[in-house]
Each structure stands twice: as structure tokens, then as C-alpha cells.
Regions:
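Interfacial segments of alpha-helical transmembrane regions
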Residues: 1-12, 73-87
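Interfacial loop at the N-terminal end of multi-pass membrane proteins
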Residues: 2-6, 11-58, 102-121
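Transmembrane helix-loop junctions in multipass membrane proteins, especially transporters and channels
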Residues: 26, 30, 68-75, 98-102, ...
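Internal alpha-helical transmembrane segments of multi-pass membrane proteins, especially GPCRs
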Residues: 46, 53, 80-83, 121-124, ...
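Core segments of transmembrane alpha-helices
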Residues: 55-66, 130-139
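Mid-bilayer segments of alpha-helical transmembrane spans in multi-pass integral membrane proteins
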Residues: 87-95
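Juxtamembrane boundary at the C-terminal end of a transmembrane helix
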Residues: 141-147
Length: 147
């Protein structure tokens, strides 16, 4: 039971952080002057780019352990879906979103071109897809734990 709570809180916080980037942070940053927007976007990309890989990995491990803990429960199939979706999301992130994030993190604020701004807008749209997939994994885990 305590492990369930730890898993739910950790995964829920990660999804909340990812959602806040898409729903609040990036829309606010887009209203700044171009140099300020570029500087802030670069800082967010650098900081979150350092933290998120570990948080994603830890949450994947939490889901796998949840599957082991609940392996004899009726909801184990639901729990099994969660890490599968999580791994798909990690692969999508590594192959598509991370390279764009690295370019944004490394940019010079004075060189924030329209091309880079369009690339950031594309990243934002793909990030929303990631948040949706993470949310589906989370709901699957919650259903599995509850069943």
C-alpha cells in the first residue's frame, strides 16, 4: 500500500511537471521578447533535460515493481500496460524530442531564429502527445492497482 502511494505520487508529479511545461510555461515564455524567450527556453531545456531522464527511469522501475507486487491481482494486465506505454514514450522522447531539446538548450539567445522558434513549436506539439501517452500509462496503472 505504501509503495502504491509512492508510485502514484512520483508518476503523478512527473506528468504534472510535463503538463505544466505544455500548458503554462511555454505559452508564457512565448509572450516574452525574443531574446528573453530564447534565454528562458534554453534554461528550462537545460535544467529539465538533466533531471527528467532519471525521473523517467525511476518511474519505469516503480511501475515494474508494481507489476511484481500485484502479479497475482486481477488488475495485473492493466499494470502491465503502463510500463509498455512508458517505454514507448521514452523511445519517442529519445529519438525525436531529445535532439530538438538539445538544440534549443544549446542555442545562443541572440540567434533565436524563426526556424528555431518553429522547431520549438513542433517540439511543443509533440510534447503534448507525450503527455497524453504518459497520462494513459498512469491511468492504466491506477486502474490496475485499484482492480
Amino acid at each position: 500500500m505504501i509503495f502504491d502511494v509512492l508510485s502514484i505520487v512520483s508518476i503523478g508529479l512527473l506528468i504534472g511537471a510535463e503538463f505544466s511545461v505544455s500548458a503554462f510555461i511555454n505559452p508564457i515564455l512565448s509572450k516574452l521578447e525574443p531574446i528573453a524567450e530564447a534565454r528562458a527556453t534554453s534554461l528550462f531545456a537545460q535544467n529539465l533535460g538533466r533531471i527528467m531522464p532519471f525521473w523517467y527511469g525511476i518511474n519505469l522501475l516503480l511501475m515494474i515493481v508494481e507489476g511484481l507486487i500485484h502479479r497475482h491481482d486481477a488488475g495485473v494486465s492493466w499494470i502491465a500496460v503502463a510500463p509498455i506505454l512508458w517505454v514507448i514514450t521514452i523511445a519517442f522522447t529519445l529519438l525525436i524530442l531529445v535532439p530538438t531539446n538539445n538544440r534549443i538548450a544549446a542555442m545562443n539567445p541572440n540567434d533565436y531564429s524563426d526556424e528555431l522558434k518553429q522547431e520549438h513549436a513542433k517540439w511543443d506539439m509533440l510534447h503534448r502527445c507525450r503527455v497524453l501517452t504518459l497520462s494513459l500509462a498512469f491511468v492504466s496503472l491506477l486502474i490496475g492497482i485499484r482492480v
